[in-house]
Amino acid sequence: MKIQFLGAAGEVTGSRHSVEVMLPGGSRRFMVDCGMFQGGREASNKNLELFPFSPKDLSFVVLTHAHIDHSGLLPRLCAQGFSGPIYCTSATFELLKILLPDSAYLQRADVERAERKQKAGKWRGEMPVALYSREEVDLALSQF
């Protein structure tokens, strides 16, 4: 078994772990959590990085709980090709039906606010990028 820590190692947010299990005749890869990094520009840049594997190669995802730093990149993972099931408790799923759409809304609002400020000449620095759309949230939620 190989475990790759893709976040929450040396920091608090961004919990995502890739697990590869060697089986007779091949291997299987799955993820435990798929969380968003939180905490400023550096964290935002980490969220934009590609996964170090093809999401299409994942068999499934297991979520430990609903917090965004454990679930917030699921829509991005699904948009990049993951099509397997996502497993969690029913309570976690109920919370995700609120948290993930809200996350997409807040990201879009940040982009729109920055665009307005830029138009008015009041924006300095990098423009924020929405990690995913409401449609990508709906795609992820359909995989539970």
Predicted regions: what is each one?
Residues 141-143:
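Eukaryotic helix-linker segments that join adjacent hydrophobic helices
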Residues 1, 12-14:
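In a subset of proteins, long, contiguous C-terminal domains/tails are tracked
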Residues 1-4, 29:
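Extreme N-terminal starter segment of soluble prokaryotic enzymes
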